[in-house]
């Protein structure tokens, strides 16, 4: 009974925390307004003598004023525009493929191929958003008075983003296949659990990317604090199930998704209770497939280590 109460409380905290972005956005804007504004120096007419001294190194030209950064809201609107743009591109591809295959009386095949195109589009959007969201992430950190995350090499950031995105695709497939389970009353609950947890994975990935948390560490966090993440992802899961039209639900997701990413920064998912929350390995299947793909890619990727290459050749 105590464990059930703890699970319910953690779910409640996650659900409530998912709406913190409403006040947090205002806090970010207030913090942005407090930033020191550097006024550019007044232009001074340069004489021939000043230019001659600049060449000789006697007189140095004053430094250029720092470029003004894009505002938080401008970056946010850019991400909104990109999300909608990717969705429109996806729909155009579906229409073109459907029209092309209609000449062979295989319109459905064209549409199905178009739906599969969401996978490469999803990968592209994740990479671009990871780059664009860095400024928003910095604004969130400053509003929370947190130290900036350590600088991560681009290659490491890209690898982590791709692995995480691949795992999310497998987890999405796992959730979609679960709707075919022959359990009438329980099957919808299982599907909902997958979608809510998947939404939390999407939202918290950007925060975890900033701190360069490994994929295994993220997996352990989600499986150890699953009631919280279940509650956090519930509002987005409910909003994206309003319509039976996949495109409409995708538009709703694209509009709400950046807001919930911002909300993940002030969220407190690591609460302590009287007893530990039972860990559920709901990522086991998707993790297994992600690991298999990772090993396959590693096996076909040429190594730069001559010793390792020599050992592989001898074996």
UniProtKB/Swiss-Prot annotation:
Its membrane topology: Multi-pass membrane protein
One Pfam family per UniProt: EI24
Observed effect of gene inactivation: Early autophagic structures and lgg-1 puncta form an irregular shape and clump together. RNAi-mediated knockdown results in increased lgg-2-positive autophagosomes following fertilization and at later embryonic stages.
Tissues of expression: Expressed in pharyngeal and body wall muscles and intestine cells.
CC per GO annotation: endoplasmic reticulum; membrane
Subcellular location(s) of the protein: Cytoplasm; Membrane
Keyword DNA-binding attached: no
Transmembrane region(s): 84-104, 113-133, 146-166, 190-210, 221-241, 242-262
UniProt KW Transmembrane keyword: yes
Keywords tagged on the record: Autophagy, Cytoplasm, Membrane, Transmembrane, Transmembrane helix
GO terms under biological process: macroautophagy; negative regulation of autophagosome assembly
Coarse class of the protein's main subcellular location: cytoplasm
Similarity section: Belongs to the EI24 family.
Function as written in the Swiss-Prot or TrEMBL entry: Involved in autophagy. Thought to act in autophagasome and omegasome formation.
Protein name (record): Ectopic P granules protein 4
């Amino acid at each position: 009974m105590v464990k059930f109460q703890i699970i319910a409380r953690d779910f409640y905290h996650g659900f409530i925390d998912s709406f913190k972005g409403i006040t947090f956005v205002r806090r970010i804007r207030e913090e942005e307004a407090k930033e020191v504004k550097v006024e550019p120096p007044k232009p001074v007419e340069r004489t021939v003598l000043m230019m001659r001294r600049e060449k000789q190194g006697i007189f140095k030209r004053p430094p250029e004023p720092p470029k003004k950064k894009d505002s938080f809201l401008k970056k946010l609107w850019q991400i909104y525009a990109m999300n909608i743009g990717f969705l429109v591109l996806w729909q155009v591809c579906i229409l073109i493929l459907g029209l092309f295959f209609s000449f062979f009386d295989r319109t459905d095949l064209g549409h199905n191929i178009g739906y599969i195109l969401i996978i490469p589009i999803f990968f592209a959007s994740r990479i671009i958003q990871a780059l664009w969201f860095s400024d928003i992430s910095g604004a969130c950190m400053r509003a929370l008075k947190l130290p900036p995350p350590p600088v991560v090499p681009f290659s490491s950031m890209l690898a982590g983003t791709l692995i995480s995105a691949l795992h999310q695709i497998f987890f999405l497939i796992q959730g979609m296949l679960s709707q075919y389970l022959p359990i009438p009353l329980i099957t919808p609950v299982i599907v909902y659990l997958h979608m809510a947890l998947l939404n939390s994975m999407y939202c918290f990935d950007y925060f975890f990317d900033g701190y360069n948390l490994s994929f295994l560490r993220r997996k352990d966090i989600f499986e150890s604090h699953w009631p919280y993440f279940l509650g956090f992802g519930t509002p987005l899961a409910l909003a994206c199930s309003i319509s039976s039209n996949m495109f409409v639900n995708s538009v709703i997701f694209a509009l709400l998704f950046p807001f919930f990413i911002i909300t993940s920064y002030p969220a407190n998912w690591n609460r302590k209770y009287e007893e530990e929350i039972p860990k559920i390995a709901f990522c086991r299947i998707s993790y297994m497939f992600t690991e298999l793909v990772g090993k396959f890619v590693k096996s076909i990727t040429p190594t730069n280590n001559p010793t390792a290459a020599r050992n592989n050749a001898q074996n």
